[in-house]
A protein has these predicted regions:
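C-terminal nucleotide
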Residues: 1-3, 8, 16, 24-57, ...
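DPxDG-like acidic metal-binding loop motif
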Residues: 19, 76-101
Length: 235
């Protein structure tokens, strides 16, 4: 996530960039392996919506998420569960109808997001949409998180180069969201002010990107870092 964290949960815009680490899902060499519950939920929704004729049997797919854990089994914050859910649905669709995952990618993205959120019990699902669509994505939920996402696909300025660094500490998104929601409950004005600062930084980010101004984007990200730190300290 580049901009709009937490504010996206309350109608703000978020920007997210896919990375070149991949979840791999293929046929399991033997039945009975573990199937993530997010994949099971996505398959069930896909059947209801006509993306699949039938849901694969649990244990019929092999999941390899090692590229998203640095090979050390640690949670790096790269969206491994989101990528695994998307890859699982894409695998199931391709197994039934080759080419269908690409042909119906927008539907795949929405279905995977809803299946993932159903199991996770919250969050925006922006990471799922980004994993499915790739590249740089903007997302807003104008009608709440249960409604349709307004999604835009964009290009980074040619002069901009991104690198991803790990902090060295694993965190659970659900726990972070719970702390921010607790702030909203006991200090709603502080919560609103902190999210407004994130929204303002996100608007700066979007303007800079549309102007193809790499330096202004860096300034916006720096401002967003301060806004996120202030939210964390308040929560």
């Amino acid at each position: 996530m580049l901009a709009g964290e937490y504010a996206v949960l309350h109608g703000g815009e978020a920007w997210c960039l896919a990375v070149d680490r991949y979840a791999v899902v293929d046929d399991a060499p033997a039945a009975g392996g573990f199937t993530p519950p997010e994949a099971i939920a996505a398959w069930r929704l896909a059947v209801a919506r006509g993306l699949l004729r039938e849901a694969p049997a649990e244990g019929s797919a092999r999941f390899d998420l090692t590229a998203l854990s640095g090979g050390v089994g640690r949670k790096l914050g790269l969206g491994s569960s989101a990528a695994g859910c998307v890859a699982a649905l894409g695998w199931a669709m391709e197994r039934e109808r080759p080419g269908s995952a690409d042909a119906r990618r927008d539907e795949l993205a929405r279905c995977a997001r809803e299946g993932h959120r159903e199991v996770q019990g919250g969050g925006s699902g922006v990471d799922v949409l980004t994993s499915a669509l790739g590249g740089l994505v903007s997302v807003r939920f104008g009608d709440g998180l249960g409604g349709e996402a307004v999604v835009g696909r964009h290009r980074l300025p040619g002069a901009l180069r991104w690198r991803v660094f790990w902090s060295g500490t694993s965190v659970r998104t659900s726990e972070m969201i719970a702390k921010v929601e607790a702030l909203r409950a006991h200090s709603p004005q502080v919560h609103a002010a902190r999210l407004a600062a994130i929204d303002a930084g996100t608007a700066d980010f979007a303007r800079a990107l549309r102007a193809d101004d790499a330096a202004a984007m860096v300034s916006a990200v720096r401002r967003l870092g301060g806004a996120m730190a202030a939210l964390g300290e308040a929560a």
